[in-house]
């Protein structure tokens, strides 16, 4: 199979898989909006940064270790087999604080994220359940990354889609027929990665599998080597959490809970958009790492060009749909028919999503830099878009233009980051 055909196979399957992952957040938002109105949407939006942090750690461990595994395997290095076990063991270590927070102080965490008394009372049960399942969220990222890098992207896609379908169906069953309310939504979300892991585990029993669990203690050295390549994935996932937290605080100050609920609509569709572009980056990663391990620089550059072109085309298609159907798209999560929320979300969608013309390229380029063992440059791109530029732009533009400035901060920060990314890519070629 040609490199181009392999690229489209890996990328398309990974996009579908990650879309499935984002769909269970959308399912939560829809059913919670039906059950609890704008307060429920505001609660979920306050919880999104916690999800992002959990996924960011899973991404750093999973993508970092799997990328290191793919490079070493292409070079015929037997040390590659130790990275899978090490990543799983460290996931359990990193998950422990989240589990303890879920057991002893979920209300403290919700207050820290900006929740008022109403939101905290509404969300304690929801937060407690999903925090207790943190190890499964993290391990799901690791298992799927290794299955994909071991040549089975189809199984990784099927596992993710099955987990997401379970979540959507049981969100409804747990919340309404069984009457569990918001804790039911959390339970459906929490169990879905367990199912995904179980399906992915079939790969490890195949004769073709080169990934296996090795009995060992957690190795800080292997962790550092993995995180070196996974830190861009960590920052990339965290960027959504940082953006959400900063925007929530600014919007609470500007217009209160209704504005946060409006941003909840924008943020949930942004999860889907980001999943699409992460699908391009993560789908190409095994192929780029393989080319790099075999010293095939031309093949790696070809994959970068394919990824960048794909990202631009997808950004144009995405914005055309969102611009053409903004009203109905906003109405999906506006069960109380709040005119003010609809007004805020309408302008938010149309301004915010302009940023994906730049964000798609930035995500693909950061994934490429990590896949070819250029972690410092990958981290610079991810840190710019995830923390430095977005925080600076949101503070400055919100002070100048109010709520529209908050929405415009995302496209402005991504445009700045795209300039930095182009500089980093060209500098290496000289």
Question: Predicted segment positions?
Answer:
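Short alpha-helical transmembrane segments in multi-pass integral membrane proteins
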Residues: 1-15, 69-133, 177-231, 288-355, ...
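Transmembrane helix-bundle signature of multi-pass secondary active exporters and lipid flippases
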Residues: 14-63, 67, 133-137, 224-290, ...
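Helix-loop interface residues and adjacent transmembrane-helix termini in multi-pass membrane transporters
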Residues: 26, 35-38, 72, 149-150, ...
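Structural signal for membrane-spanning alpha-helices in multi-pass inner-membrane proteins
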Residues: 29, 102, 145, 171, ...
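Membrane-helix interface/capping residues of multi-pass secondary transporters
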Residues: 29, 38-41, 153, 182, ...
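Small-residue-rich hydrophobic transmembrane alpha-helices
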Residues: 41-100, 137-156, 262-326, 359-378
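Hydrophobic transmembrane alpha-helices of multi-pass small-molecule transporters
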Residues: 53-56, 167-171, 197-201, 271-275, ...
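Short runs within selected transmembrane alpha-helices of multi-pass transporters and secretion channels
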Residues: 62, 129-148, 156-167, 185-200, ...
